[in-house]
Structures are given as C-alpha cells and as structure tokens.
Regions:
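Catalytic donor nucleotide-activated moiety binding site of glycosyltransferases and closely related
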Residues: 3-40
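Short hydrophobic segments within beta-strands
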Residues: 19, 76, 166-167
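Catalytic binding pocket for nucleotide-activated donors in carbohydrate/polymer assembly enzymes
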Residues: 27-34, 61-127
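Short acidic alpha-helix that forms the nucleotide-activated donor recognition element
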Residues: 43-51
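Acidic donor-binding loop of glycosyltransferase active sites
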Residues: 50-61
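C-terminal amphipathic helix plus adjacent low-complexity
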Residues: 105-168
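A short, glycine/small-residue-rich beta-strand->loop->alpha-helix junction that serves as a flexible
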Residues: 167-180
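N-terminal strand-loop element at the rim of the active site
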Residues: 169-172, 185, 189-192
Length: 192
C-alpha cells in the first residue's frame, strides 16, 4: 500500500528505482506505477547507482559503497524493531550519520530535502582509501610489494602455500553455489 501512496506523491521528474530481494520481486506489479520502476537487471548495480541523485536503503551494505559518491543516503527503517530482533546488525544504526525514516511520507520529504548531515567521520572510517587510483595502489602493494601507504596485516606464516582464487562477482547462481561446495571439499592441510 505504501508503494502506491508513494507513487501518487512523486512528481513527474522524480523516479524511484526499486531493487527488491528476488523473493519479493514477484509481489510487486510495476505496471501499476507511474514513477516507481524496477531496478534495471541488465546493468551493473554500481554503474547505475553512479547516476542516482540519492540512495534509499534498508539494512543493505550497499550504502557503504554508495557513500564514496558523497551523495545523499536515506535509511528506510520501517521494520526496524522486527529486523533488529530477528537479524541484528553489525553496526548500530545510531552510529550512522544518515537520516532514518519509517514511513513513505517521511521518506518523500527526506528525498526532496538537501543533504543535511556530516558523513566525514563515516567516510574516514569506512572509505579511507577511496580515490581514482585505489585499484592500482592495491595491486601495486599486494602484487608488486610497493609501499603505497595502505594499511595491511601480514598473515602468520604457517608454512603452507597461499592460493588466491578469483571467482568473478559471486552472483547468486549455480556457478557460485558450485564454487562454494567445491571449496568445502578442498584439502587445506597443504595450502591456505
């Protein structure tokens, strides 16, 4: 019901792209809405988020990545008590600088308001290495052994060979499930 009410309140130049959990996706008929659209499945999530004016998230960790854009983040915590009771969080919501709203009217007001919070401390804590060269710096430091000023922690030497497995984006599909099953079968007595 809230989605219908929110859609009616959105102006012609306001579009809300909704990325629902796959289980919930079939419960929403996007054809009923004028300004609420399904999140594009044919585009990379982060590429699409780069063009967004703001991010509305529940308890998903996507806001950690989006924070690097320094654009507005809104936490939609309509089911906070239930979520905290049933699932819990790694970080208290009170430690986050982002506005929290629990109903569609407050969400709409917050979406239309300017960013009015200081996320400097959050960015320093969780995104200290965010810059245009961060991937190069990480590779240079880890692969080439260059000191790029990145904080690292050495693994204790247990005499075993270290193996790095790159498995793509670990999308929720059969390939990822097979990889996870395979990893449980590996003999870890000779290699890390």
């Amino acid at each position: 019901q809230s989605l219908y009410a929110l859609d009616k309140e959105l102006n012609g130049n306001e579009v809300l792209y909704l990325n629902l959990h796959p289980v919930s996706q079939s419960t929403v008929n996007f054809g009923d809405f004028k300004n609420i659209k399904p999140f594009p499945s044919n585009l990379d999530t982060y590429d699409f988020l780069n063009i967004a004016d703001c991010l509305v998230s529940d308890y998903s960790s996507v806001f950690f990545d989006f924070a690097c854009t320094k654009k507005k983040i809104i936490l939609f915590t309509f089911d906070k008590e239930e979520y905290l009771r049933d699932r819990g969080l790694y970080i208290s919501l009170d430690e986050l600088p982002y506005p929290q709203v629990s109903d569609y009217k407050a969400l709409l007001d917050e979406m239309r308001a300017e960013k009015n919070y200081d996320d400097t401390e959050f960015l320093q804590k969780f995104c200290p290495y965010d810059n245009i060269n961060s991937s190069k710096q990480l590779c240079d430091q880890i692969i080439l052994g260059k000191d790029c000023g990145l904080k690292t922690e050495s693994m204790p030497n247990n005499g075993k060979e270290n193996v790095l497995i790159f498995a793509g984006n670990l999308a929720p599909n059969g390939v990822t499930a097979s990889l996870r099953n395979l990893l449980t079968l590996l003999d870890k007595s000779e290699r890390n």
